[in-house]
């Protein structure tokens, strides 16, 4: 018996009412973009608005949309979005609805609460995890903090006319972390070890050549790993000390002075890891896979050297239209893989005269 075809499906709720059937005959395309870090995830829906006798009712800005994607009834909830932009175009007449992910379940406020500026200080030796938990509680959110990030002890921090989310992003970047508000949770994880809004680790997705429609890898030594130098001030000795991560050229010296050696080392390590990751970038497209998430890990196997290996997703775009369901991915090479690529290759064996050519 022939296998039944697998059909992509979606479900869309507007203010908790199911509108899937209502928009089905008008749907031109649906695109969900999952971004790494603070960049807002976005939902874009394009509808045919060609019949003047039956124009589509304009959805109010601030309306909540809940999207689920999958195949043949096996749907996975993607997230909650707030409509913030409408576009009407012609000809033919079309309506495009754009909505951004909201960090708060059941909230029309979007990011506004986290974006309000504040002025305050955080005392020396405050653990990073305590900062995240305090801010999460202030916004009635649940903190989900990776243990390796929670234990980082901070020097004195001043939050001067700075929003809570900008302050957290600044701290996360300093220690090579990623902060993301989603679904009522404030998630802080080490870059490349991200978690879902529920706090679960994002599973590794394994891909072989048959899974992929096309791919492109860009390799560059422009930044290289090199050496990153960070400075800290030794108060008792009244002198500047340095911490080095990596080796060789190019040498990058961080301009900021740090208050303790462990803070300087963490900053240097974060910058070094970021430089190494930027040496190799991947873009690929494939049939739709809702399990591919930004900050998730890909394991490519069976490709040529330089492509096979571990990658960290920086952006995943899921598109559904009359051509089917597709996923497009942008990724950076995982730090350990990229570091291995920078090592000098073993010297080629010396060629001998009169030796006949050989083949594998």
Go through each PLM region and give its residues.
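Short beta-strand-centered interaction patches in the first periplasmic/extracellular domains
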Residues: 94, 101-104, 145-213
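Short, compositionally biased
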Residues: 81-89, 192-194, 311-323
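Extracytoplasmic/secreted envelope proteins and their assembly/folding machinery
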Residues: 80, 129-132, 165-169, 227-228, ...
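Short acidic/polar beta-strand-loop edge motifs in secreted extracellular
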Residues: 106-134, 145-170, 286
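An acidic/polar, Gly/Ser/Thr-rich interaction patch typically located in mid-to-C-terminal regions
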Residues: 26, 30-60, 211-360
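Assembly/oligomerization scaffold segments
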Residues: 1-104
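Long, low-complexity intrinsically disordered regions
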Residues: 134-146, 350-360
